[in-house]
Amino acid sequence: MYVAVKGGEKAIAAAHALQAHRRRGDDALPELSVAQIEQQLNLAVDRVMTEGGIADRELAALALKQASGDNVEAIFLLRAYRTTLAKLAVSEPVNTAEMRLERRISAVYKDIPGGQLLGPTYDYTHRLLDFTLLANGETPQLSVSVAEQDASPHVFSLLANQGLAKAEEDTGSTPDDITRTPPVYPCSRSSRLQQLMRGDEGYLLALAYSTQRGYGRNHPFAAEIRSGYIDIEIVPEELGFAVNIGELLMTECEMVNGFVAPENEDPHFTRGYGLVYGLSERKAMAMALVDRALQAPDYGEHIAGPAQDEEFVLAHADNVEAAGFVSHLKLPHYVDFQAELELLKRLQRERANG
């Protein structure tokens, strides 16, 4: 017979101490500093910031260190800390067209105003292990030059000017805030994009991949992917004008998708949109693909795949919520299991007795 297993504070404290010891590792080796994580594991920091909802590289690096490199645990830590922060102001909408570019590519036009800029990327590597890194080699040297950045309008604005795509218009409405108001379905576009930005990268990547394999009407081209620094401004009440409070490294992706032919409009391309912190390019692309898939009802398209089901996609995208629900199965369920056990034994006795 199953009985309750008793534990206590001492056992829990010992478990935490053991975890801290494993996190530190061999104390004969130098401890990994938060600054090293921030600078040298920058893509992991970008993901934790994006899905954790705080644009603070030091805090994201600290969370990664505390979580022993577990991204989901680090995201959980950052989300928990976020709930303790006061909301001091709301920033002005960012203008990504004025981004100080680090990288900009387009898969639909070779020559675009402002040009293409490869920037930092793993795209053209051979994916072979670099064993020289085991020797703690020298810092890579870069040649430095000064260049003027030409105006770099969005590729979608060029399509819109030709009547090939609809221009996005600011309605002036206040965006939803999913940190203050729980999402409901169907939800607004602003709520959807916020949930996708905070959604798990692997989950969104799988859904985006599914749209390319026929589970949803989606034939995309990467109209533009741009990464760089964006100015952040707020308007203090006592001043009444915008004040620059810093800049953020962000990545934006716009996917141009198959065209539609509405009755009262000219046929035009549709778009999917993604925007994330840092250089999380894969996440931005997946977000843009899923965003377009979720627009299926807006265009009267048949729902043919899971990526087009808004409630299914968004209700399961949050890895903190998902990990919490799955992890709760580790908690004691002795009474529940005892009930199942007694029922099973009774059914076996009834079958044995005919």
Please annotate each region the language model reported:
Residues 1-227, 241-243, 349-354:
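Short, amphipathic alpha-helical interaction segments embedded in low-complexity terminal/linker regions
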Residues 143-354:
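Acidic, serine/proline-rich low-complexity intrinsically disordered regions
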